[in-house]
From Swiss-Prot:
This is Isopentenyl-diphosphate Delta-isomerase. GO terms for molecular function: isopentenyl-diphosphate delta-isomerase activity; metal ion binding. Binds 1 Mg(2+) ion per subunit. The magnesium ion binds only when substrate is bound. Its EC number is 5.3.3.2. SUPFAM superfamilies: Nudix. The keyword tRNA processing does not apply. InterPro entries: Idi_bact (IPR056375), IsopentenylPP_isomerase_typ1 (IPR011876), NUDIX_hydrolase-like_dom_sf (IPR015797), NUDIX_hydrolase_dom (IPR000086). It comes from Corynebacterium efficiens (strain DSM 44549 / YS-314 / AJ 12310 / JCM 11189 / NBRC 100395).
Amino acid sequence: MTNEEELVVLADEEGNAIGTAPKATVHTTDTPLHFAFSSYILNPRGELLVTRRALSKKTWPGVWTNSMCGHPAPDETNADAIRRRGVSELGLDFGSFLDIQVVLDDYRYRAEDSSGIVEWEICPVHLVRLAVGEFVEPLPDEVEEFAWEEPQKVFDAVDATPFVFSPWMVDQLSHPELRQAILEAFDPEA
């Protein structure tokens, strides 16, 4: 499915779905509130996948961010959307996902990038665990580069240089419960 075909589910302030719009037309200087998801993907050792957004991205090109974000299609659960985007964006197999857990169910944010494009999303944050032996092969149109890092190193980098990371990642990681969930999954002995 291309951006031109992909639909985004629009929302009202109370979090109710109120319609859809083509993804290609939604992100502007006057972006309507819509549903999205954000995910932090961990390998079996608990290392965190961080990605650098492709330079061709409309918003925040070249910025380091969490593992993967996206938009659920109409009538699609966030878990199914995460699997779909994991396949299409990161080159994972549909069966790669051991566990998908919601950590910040009510997360929402509004941010404006330097070009004036606005992100305004109701965006539950998920922790995703991958099966042993899974490899990431990101699409170049989505991901410029990626790294698997110890979670505390990522937290330290975000705290020291927040301007290098997406505003939603910085904001999400300001929630102690997300950091704790990620740290609890880290097992360097695995």
